[in-house]
Each structure stands twice: as structure tokens, then as C-alpha cells.
Amino acid sequence: MTLLTVFRFALAGVSLASIARSDATTSSADWPVYLGGKERSLYSSLTQINRTNVSRLEVAWTYDTGDTDEYQANNLVVGGVLYTPSPTRKVIALDAATGKELWKWDPASERADRGRARQRGLVYWQNENGGERRLFTGVGQQLYALDPKTGQLIREFGENGSVNLESGLTTPGVIYRDILILGGLGGRGAIRAFDVRTGKLRWIFHLIPRPGEVGYDTWPKEAWKTATGAMPWCGQSLDEKRGIVYVATKTAEPDFYGGARHGMNLFANSVVALEAATGKRLWHFQIVHHDLLDKDLPCPPVLLTVTHKGKKIDAVAQGTKHGLLFVFNRVTGEPLWPIEERPVPQSDLRGEQAWPTQPFPSKPAPLMRQRYTEADASNLSPETQQMTLDRIRASPNFGPFPAPSLNETVMFPGFDGGMEWGGGAVDPAGVYYVNVNEIPWLLQMVETRRPDGTPLPRGERDYLVHCAACHGIDRKGLPAAGFPSLLDIEKRRTSAEIAHITRNGFGRMPAFDKIPEPQREALLAYVLGQPAASASGRPDEASAKKSNDKTPPYAFGGFRRWTDQAGYPAINPPWGTLNAVDLNTGELKWKVPLGEYRELSAKGIPPTGTENYGGPVATAGGLLFIAATADETIRAFDQTTGKILWQAPLPFGGNATPSTYAVAGRQYVVISAGGGKSGRPAGGMIVAFALPSP
């Protein structure tokens, strides 16, 4: 019997009482904002479901979007209506008490390019008296405004209902008064604010500084004209009372070679505090200098209040892919505990100038191992242990900041954390709850020139520079991480479709419209296995010589997890954990494995934890709800001890962050279940749990 069959059997007989929706304004019973609030605290004051009764939770309703792709949405609930962006970027409104569909908006109605960006949430806005309401969603490079009651486009917004962002959008922005503050996925780094009624640009802050702006001297002169990256893709948080928005940014590009971007590269890999009304910079802290390892900040800053040295401090906490927590006074930017600059390995790549030091917080302690040593070799079997020992001796790990090299090294902490986009939850007592990955990866750079120094053919060279990081040197991709194989792509898409995607971008893939057309055609010819000149009739070598000086001499060899012979992470467990950290003291309260491989548990191996994507929700009922794991299970943990109090199977992996809300006095916990991560089956379902009806 399959897990989906078991799940459907568990659902059978559940009564789905129809409860009338409310048109009231938002309340504490709602989940009206991505991650629960503009503070991104992932906290709910609801208490109906608590430690004493959580074991009685049952499926209340389900809804199938009909899509089969990764479903990472943190769903909104306002006035008894649940709003979700489906895996194919549809926007759907459901009765939050029954799961009954109320309306559905399909971007195909606007001939929109859906892209493939994982859409993790929506933005709901209403004016003070609730007379004006809008629901914002990103599809491809467009920002759309919908009527929350009908799902119809609001045509007076932007140009006929949408604004061209010139960049994809995976994480929703944040509302301050009547402006929507947004980041993006690619392009030249900037955070922007738009008028919620008209779509007009209200302000812009350049994250790759221009002449006269703070940080301009941390880049080569004139870099702002061509440099890309530093975008805040993971979202923002807002101190609404003070009018301060907090932004977490990504790596400068190219991610793994910085020979053309010498310097610290502000404001990449930084927490930046801006005046929300104007975009004026208030303070910043760069968490990774001159990043060469794609260690961008993966989750939005979280706002909380702690007691520090006997005083109440309004703080902001930022998690990282290294499993580190940086905590600052959110008004002044001063760290609550000292941050040390420590020497890190230097690169031996020609033309690279790695930054000599990197910042490390003295507290809290890292939430994961910071170096893979021989003591971490996998102990699942003698054969596995020997295999991992042999590899770590041949390709040693150099800690959290290995210098990219032509020699292979073990990358640990890995490319996907540490912490990831789910982020952490905080309760009013100042305790931070967060899930962490402990998965090793492999790091290696490749040359874009032949041994004699002459350039590789133009198409192959551009593939290594622009495509191999995700699709691999061998073009096989990494489907488990969402990077498809390009082998035989001509059998799945037409040449025109491939050319359109290459030029305009698609999901996480950036647009290559700035690459000269002859180069783009040579790249396509290489991907399609055609002779280099066949795409345009122009000799490839002439094109290569013309632009040789602009091509990086090295490219990233691709994202590769390190696994053992059976496909498990090639390291001693735990492979995924859930952690509680008291940010009043900076001390770890508890750590437990998150998830399990049932076949290993059946052999008597204690729960190992699994790779995890999606975050936790803390409630005033003393609970933590989290799915995220590869074992297609949602769990409730005791906030005080980390003990599992309840768990239930999901039809697909819950690689999303739950929401909790109440309708007509009944509390629900809802999760998007779409799987697709870690090589697991993909779907597109929403599952809501509640206590049995009276």
C-alpha cells in the first residue's frame, strides 16, 4: 500500500462541515501575512490545539490543485478565506473551514510566462477600514494585483493589472502603509517599493552601489554598470512601529569566482536596515565578505524582543547557511554578542582575491558541525565508513570557508545549509526555533581554457560559466535539487522554446538577454549538440577571440551532494535537526533529529534526521508544527523539550511552512504538500488538520 493510499484511507469518513466565511478585517485568528506576520516570527497566539490534545489531531479537509511540482507556499488566511499560489503559479481561494474552492486565477488568462520560480507566498493588503483590498502575486517577471473577493485582475494597477519587475520573484514582499517593498531573484541588485494602488515605483535602494553611494568603494570602479546579484530573494521583515524594513541579500555574481569583482562587495550577503517610507539606509552588516561559495542569506531577518544584560532589547536575528545566528539591536545595528573576524583559507585561482577574514558570532554557538573530520565518516556500515574515510582523506574539508580550487574538496556546511528559506520561529519569551541541514556537498572549479591557454570553444565556455553550476559539467543536472537534465532537451522542447527561455529566463534561471546574440547562439548549439557555427553561420572561434577578455577563466563545476553507495548523506548522522535557542542568553536549549528514514529505523538505527526544506510554526499552545522532511510527515514538537507529541503522514512531502488559523472557533493547521525535493514524488495538495468536531 502506498503512502498516498494510506493517507486517503485516513481521510475517509472525515466530516467536512461547511462554515460560513467572514468578511471581517484581519484578526489574531487569521494568518494574513507570509510567515505569520511582518516580523516573520512564525508565531501564533492560538491555544485551542495544545500539548494536552494535539495527539487527537485529524485531517479536516484536503484540496488538490491538480499540479505536480514543488509546492512551497506558506498559505494566507484572512476572514475565513485561504489564499494560495499553486505550483504552476495559479492563485486559488478556498473556504478555510472546508477546503471548498471559491475562485481560481490562472496566469494563462493573461498569456503570462509562468516561469518556474517556486512561489512561496502572496501579499494581502487592505486599507484602514477594509474598503480597499488587493492580493499580490508574482508570475515570471510580472507583479499582478488581484481582487481577493473575485480573483479578477485590478486593471488600474500598473499596466492593465501588472508591473514588469524585470526579475523573477519567489518570496513575497512586505507592505508598509500603502507601499509594497520587494526584492527579486536576479539582475542588478536593488530593493524597490511600489505604490499598492497604482504600481508606480516609490523608491529604490541600490544593493550594488553607484558613484557617491555608501559601499561604492567595495567594488571595482564602474562595476555597477555590469555587476549582477546581491538581490534580496528570501524576503524582508518590517518593524511597522518604527518604519524600518530589514533586508537579507544574496551573493554577488558570478557566485564562485570573484576575479572581476575584487573587494568586499557591499551590499551582497548583508543585513540592511532601511527607512521603509523612503529607502534611506540606516545601518548594515555584511555577514560574508566577497562571497565565493554561494553562501547568500537564505531566510528573512526575524524580529523579536529579548532581555539582554538586564534590559529589554528589540532585536533582529539572521540565520545563515553555515548554521550561524547573528543577533543585532534592530535600531542601532549593534551586535548583542561580539562578532569576530577570523582568518579563512585563501584561493589559489589566478586573478582571485579572496577576502582574508570572515565574521563569526561569539554567541550563539553554531547549530551544526563546522568542519567534516575523519570522526564524521559515516558509520552506517563498515563499507560506507571506509568509502567516506577514503574520500575525506583525498578531498579534505577546510571548514565553513574553503577556497574554491581546481582540486575537489568536501563542502561542509553544504550549499543548502545550515538554515534554508524556511527560516526560524520565535516565541514571546525570546526563544528561536529553527531546522538545520547537515549534508555534505562537493566543491570543484573548472578551467574555461585549454591546457595551452587557448580558450575553449565559445559555446562550451559559456556553458561552463553560465550553466554548469546548476546543470553540471556533464549536463545531467541535479533533479533532486530542482536542476533538470539538459541531455536530449531537444526532445522535450522546441528550438524556439529553448531560445526563448535562454533569452528571457525561466524560474530560477536568469535571463541571458545581456549576452550578445552570437554567444547565446553558440551556447544553444553546444547544449543541443550542434556544430558551433550552425546556429548563426558565424565561426565560433572568431566569436570566442572577440570576447575572450570578458570571460572568467574559471567556472563552478556544479552542485553535487556527497552520498554513499545507498544514496544516504556521506556523513555520520544527524542529517537534519530541529533546534531551540534562547536568544536572551545565546544558549542552546535543545536539539533533536528532524525526520527519519524508516528503512534505517527498522534496522535499529536511531532516527537520523533528513534533509529539510520549509520552516516551523510556534504557537501559544506550547507547540512547534513542522513538516519539511524527506519522509513525507508533519510533526508537532513540545517547545520546552523537543519531544514529538504528534505526527501524521502527508500525501507528498511538506516542503513548505505551515500556517495556523481559526474559523468559527475551530483552530486549523494547514500545510502545502507538493514534494519534489530530495528525489521524492511531486504533487500539489493542501492538507488541513484540526481537532475532532464537537
Give residue spans per PLM region:
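N-terminal pre-domain segments of enzymes
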Residues: I19-Q48, W355-L389, R538-G557
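Mature N-terminal segment immediately following signal peptide/propeptide cleavage
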Residues: D23-E70, N74-V77, G333, N579-V581
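Detector for the c-type heme attachment site
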Residues: G36, R330, E438, C470-G477, ...
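Extracytoplasmic/lumenal domain signature
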Residues: T52-G66, V91-A112, N129-G130, Q142-S167, ...
